[in-house]
Amino acid sequence: MNPSSRRQFVKEAMTGIGFLTLPSFSGASTIARPLKIVCVGAHPDDPESGCGATLAKFAAAGHAVTIIYLTRGEAGIPGKSNDEAAAIRSKEAIAACSLLKAKPIFAGQVDGDTVINNEWVKKMQDLLGSEKPDIVFTHWPIDSHKDHQCASLLTIQSWIRASIKFELYFFEVCAGEQTLGFKPTDYVDITDTQELKRKAVYCHVSQDPPGIYACGHTAMEQFRGLEMGTAAAEAFMRMTGKKKGNYFDL
């Protein structure tokens, strides 16, 4: 498929998703095939809290959604061993993915001990390559949590090495405390999927869902909605530069 055809295909497939900076294609008819959407998060609950409503919109529009969890959140439950916590949090992640109509994949790193090396760059590249994504979401790399940084940088390195570039977008979590220096380029109106996102986040019972929202996510959704001109929104930063993919003329 030539670059022009790819651009048109993705534009048509984006009908109804609602990115502020992408053209509206509400009049588009059929699409050649569903998009393949992948989200890479450091722990169970990161993709859900960062861009769960956007993932839900993609799934509702008929696109295939996969969530790759870098770890199983092994260090995330005080008083539980790594294996015990991993079992609990994996079950929570699977329940959240079921709500979002997403396929869960657990990459195999360990919460709190994540690494970036050639072996793991290759593993992430292979994971993403097997999914053949059109669009990938991951953490913004400037983050106070090392695991978030690792998930982001492994994804970025995979994108750099990809023979066929996918669109790469970064999401925010607990802005100002974890995600730092985040200046959105794109927004998604999540008014219709905000409640589904909340239900997915609340699947992570072990992580104190009210605390997740108290960390700033309620305010983030409201503030990003104010910026977009809607009741609620999720915000993203788009990868740009020489190596950017050829999907959109923005």
Give short role names for the model-derived ranges.
Residues 45, 71, 93, 104, ...:
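Divalent metal-coordination and catalytic microenvironments
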Residues 75, 80-100:
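Glycine-rich phosphate-binding loop and adjoining beta1-alpha1-beta2 segment
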Residues 37-44, 48-82:
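ATP-dependent adenylation/pyrophosphate-handling site
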Residues 70, 97-112:
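A conserved beta-strand->alpha-helix junction
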Residues 11-18, 26-40, 80, 98, ...:
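Metal-dependent de-N-acetylase/amidase catalytic core
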Residues 65, 104, 168:
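Hydrophobic anchor at the start of a short beta-strand
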Residues 1-4:
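N-terminal secretory signal peptides
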